[in-house]
């Protein structure tokens, strides 16, 4: 099992990144809340991974901290929640925000996440509330920030919007929903990561 990768960040194609370790490039699926905190392209990154083996694929899911990975593993234990939905949940909100929603039984916020209906939201609360006691205390997760993403490479607006749309669709949002969210938050000069961040905020 691959549990940790340390290497050079080669690409950010949200919600996927490419990290090179010992001359080998690993494709890793990451929640947007974690991608925002990554270093610049070309710099060293440390990713804690969860390895999933399916009949048709072998997938790596990555996180910036051991605690974020642990939360992801708890989320996908819930009945009816797989890795793809777990990724979408932790992209729509930070780990701390998710823990708070579960603790407060905030169903109305959880159902705004892609693929999460009322029954799934209720199941998450019922199954996870006791398991997550104490998780919201202290600095267990990557601190949430409203600052711009660290990658300041200029991006052509149209390309940024296309990349943002692709990321939202990969996370499970419907095309009309994704298009509307991106259009509403788009501003001149925004990078694709900024667009994704603001679009996700507008839908939660």
UniProtKB/Swiss-Prot annotation:
InterPro entries cross-referenced by the UniProt entry: DNA_helicase_Holl-junc_RuvA_I, Hlx-hairpin-Hlx_DNA-bd_motif, NA-bd_OB-fold, RuvA, RuvA_2-like, RuvA_C, RuvA_C_sf
Region of interest called Domain II, as start-end residue ranges on this chain: 65-143
Domain I: region residues: 1-64
Localization: Cytoplasm
Renumbered residue ranges of the record's region Flexible linker: 144-155
Region (Domain III), start-end ranges: 156-204
Keywords: Cytoplasm, DNA damage, DNA recombination, DNA repair, DNA-binding
GO MF, one annotated term: four-way junction helicase activity
A cellular component term, taken from the record's GO annotations: Holliday junction helicase complex
BP GO terms, sorted: DNA recombination; DNA repair; SOS response
Coiled-coil ranges from the UniProt annotation: none
Domain observations: Has three domains with a flexible linker between the domains II and III and assumes an 'L' shape. Domain III is highly mobile and contacts RuvB.
Function: The RuvA-RuvB-RuvC complex processes Holliday junction (HJ) DNA during genetic recombination and DNA repair, while the RuvA-RuvB complex plays an important role in the rescue of blocked DNA replication forks via replication fork reversal (RFR). RuvA specifically binds to HJ cruciform DNA, conferring on it an open structure. The RuvB hexamer acts as an ATP-dependent pump, pulling dsDNA into and through the RuvAB complex. HJ branch migration allows RuvC to scan DNA until it finds its consensus sequence, where it cleaves and resolves the cruciform DNA.
Subunit structure: Homotetramer. Forms an RuvA(8)-RuvB(12)-Holliday junction (HJ) complex. HJ DNA is sandwiched between 2 RuvA tetramers; dsDNA enters through RuvA and exits via RuvB. An RuvB hexamer assembles on each DNA strand where it exits the tetramer. Each RuvB hexamer is contacted by two RuvA subunits (via domain III) on 2 adjacent RuvB subunits; this complex drives branch migration. In the full resolvosome a probable DNA-RuvA(4)-RuvB(12)-RuvC(2) complex forms which resolves the HJ.
Family: Belongs to the RuvA family.
NCBIfam families referenced in this protein's UniProt entry, alphabetically: ruvA (TIGR00084)
Name by which UniProt lists this protein: Holliday junction branch migration complex subunit RuvA
Organism: Vibrio cholerae serotype O1 (strain ATCC 39315 / El Tor Inaba N16961)
Organism phylogeny: Bacteria, Pseudomonadati, Pseudomonadota, Gammaproteobacteria, Vibrionales
């Amino acid at each position: 099992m691959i549990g940790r990768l340390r290497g050079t960040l080669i690409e950010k194609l949200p919600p996927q990144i490419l990290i090179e370790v010992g001359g080998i490039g690993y494709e890793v699926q990451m929640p947007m809340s974690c991608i925002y905190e990554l270093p610049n392209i070309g710099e060293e990154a440390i990713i804690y991974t969860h390895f999933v083996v399916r009949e048709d694929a072998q997938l790596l899911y990555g996180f910036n901290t051991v605690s974020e990975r642990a939360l992801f593993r708890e989320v996908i234990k819930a009945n009816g929640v797989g890795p793809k939905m777990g990724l979408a949940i932790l992209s729509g909100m930070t780990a701390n925000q998710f823990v708070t929603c579960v603790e407060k039984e905030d169903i109305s916020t959880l159902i705004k996440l892609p693929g999460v209906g009322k029954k799934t939201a209720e199941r998450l609360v019922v199954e996870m509330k006791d398991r997550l006691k104490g998780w919201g205390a202290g600095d267990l997760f990557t601190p949430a920030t409203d600052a711009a993403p660290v990658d300041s490479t200029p991006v052509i607006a149209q390309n940024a919007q296309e990349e943002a749309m692709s990321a939202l669709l990969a996370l499970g949002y419907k095309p009309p929903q994704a298009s509307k969210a991106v259009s509403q938050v788009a501003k001149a000069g925004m990078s694709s990561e900024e667009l994704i961040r603001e679009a996700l905020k507008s839908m939660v």
